[in-house]
């Protein structure tokens, strides 16, 4: 009897520990939306004849720089490589996830070309529904959840997709039939991007229920990103003769593309932590609120809706309200004890499959990793860490000195206001992550 009670008590404590990160995950996901929505703003300052492949490659080069810099700043390379050493079986998964991202991003290029951003963006935002499906099938998410919570997640995700459609149509001006001749290919490309971006979260989730730190995962993830984008330029954009390798104008544009990549990395890191603490089904819909923030930058800073009529403005207001309500529904769907038990079972399957220490993995997954890691691994930093940080800062300073911004009307007041939102959201999210998990 005592043994049974002890086992029950342990299971309950484990389930409680697994569910303790919901609030933190919501903060991370909403912060991801803020930063991912702002990531496209610097690229609006790029006015060149470079192909989308070239622009994507340059932006991912900025991503690569930031991907190595931020983990080094927060944890140090000793920690990152020790974590990778404990999870060698996940390195290939991380590279594969990066490749999926790069291919999906390329499909969005074709989707935008063929049907326009207004239609393409809402279509690939259905990746949240793909993610909910994979989360349920592979990781037991929503298994054991109450009907109320299931309804909150599903209806909230659908509301966010519907809001994305409304916000997309609010930006339509002029002839909407310009892309009509390639509509089918554009829709298929956007649907493909949705499928790949929803599937990309499988390696994410698999890594985190194995105890891997998101900072370590993204360090390897970016290798797949950069390698695939480089291969796409070589295969589809002129090979070694591509303009990105030879154009004298490229040095004036790189700062803005690198800056966009850096902003995107901050958002994606928040999204990674959200996936860890919320699961796929809740994290993707909440981070997809990025379209609301992207619209805010376009409308308020760049004046993209300056000539919109009353109907378009009504769509903006209605879409914004629906998206906020959808996010509210998902964020309040706190996992029950039964659902947390399903998560623990998925975690134990990974531990059994790969011979992992279940106690260490549970501690790492719940953000209590520092209690089990060695002090030397946590605190020691090599001299090369400071070299990496200095080199990255030097790259941005050099590119900034050569940057040229085309004449473009911007609302300075809103630029500073939205910039302040970025800083405050990152500070709040970062302080919560540090206080609760020490960035674990």
Where are these predicted regions, by residue range?
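Polytopic alpha-helical membrane proteins, predominantly small-molecule transporters/carriers
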Residues: 2-440
């Amino acid at each position: 009897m005592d043994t049974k009670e002890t086992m029950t008590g342990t299971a309950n404590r484990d389930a409680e520990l697994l569910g303790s990160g919901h609030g933190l995950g919501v903060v991370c996901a909403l912060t991801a939306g803020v930063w991912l929505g702002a990531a496209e703003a610097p690229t609006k300052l790029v006015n060149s004849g470079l192909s989308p492949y070239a622009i994507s490659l340059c932006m991912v080069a900025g991503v690569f720089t930031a991907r190595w810099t931020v983990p080094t700043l927060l944890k140090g390379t000793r920690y990152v490589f020790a974590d990778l050493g404990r999870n060698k079986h996940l390195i290939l998964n991380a590279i594969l996830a990066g490749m999926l991202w790069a291919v999906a991003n390329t499909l969005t290029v074709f989707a935008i070309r063929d049907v326009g951003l207004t239609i393409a963006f809402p279509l690939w935002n259905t990746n949240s529904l793909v993610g909910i499906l994979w989360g349920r099938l592979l990781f037991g998410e929503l298994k054991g959840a109450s009907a109320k919570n299931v309804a909150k997640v599903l209806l909230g995700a659908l509301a966010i997709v519907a809001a994305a459609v409304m916000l997309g149509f609010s930006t339509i001006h002029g002839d909407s039939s310009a892309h009509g001749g390639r509509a089918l290919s554009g829709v298929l490309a956007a649907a493909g991007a949705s499928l790949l971006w929803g599937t990309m979260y499988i390696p994410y989730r698999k890594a985190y229920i194995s105890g891997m730190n998101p900072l370590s995962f993204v360090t390897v993830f970016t290798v797949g990103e950069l390698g695939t984008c480089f291969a796409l330029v070589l295969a589809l954009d002129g090979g070694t003769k591509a303009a990105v390798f030879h154009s004298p104008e490229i040095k004036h544009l790189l700062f803005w593309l690198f800056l966009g990549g850096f902003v995107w990395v901050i958002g994606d890191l928040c999204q990674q932590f959200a996936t860890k603490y919320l699961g796929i089904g809740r994290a993707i819909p909440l981070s997809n609120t990025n379209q609301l923030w992207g619209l805010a930058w376009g409308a308020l800073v760049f004046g993209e809706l300056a000539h919109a009529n009353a109907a378009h403005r009504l769509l903006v207001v209605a879409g914004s309200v629906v998206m906020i309500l959808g996010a509210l529904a998902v964020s309040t769907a706190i996992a029950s004890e039964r659902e947390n038990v399903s998560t623990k079972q998925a975690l134990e399957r990974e531990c059994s499959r790969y011979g992992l220490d279940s106690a260490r993995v549970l501690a790492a997954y719940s953000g209590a990793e520092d209690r089990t890691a060695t002090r030397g691994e946590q605190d020691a930093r090599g001299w090369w860490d400071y070299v990496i940080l200095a080199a990255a800062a030097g790259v941005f300073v050099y590119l900034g000195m050569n940057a040229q911004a085309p004449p473009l009307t911007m609302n300075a007041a809103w630029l500073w206001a939205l910039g302040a939102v970025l800083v405050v959201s990152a500070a709040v999210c970062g302080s919560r992550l540090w206080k609760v998990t020490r960035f674990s």
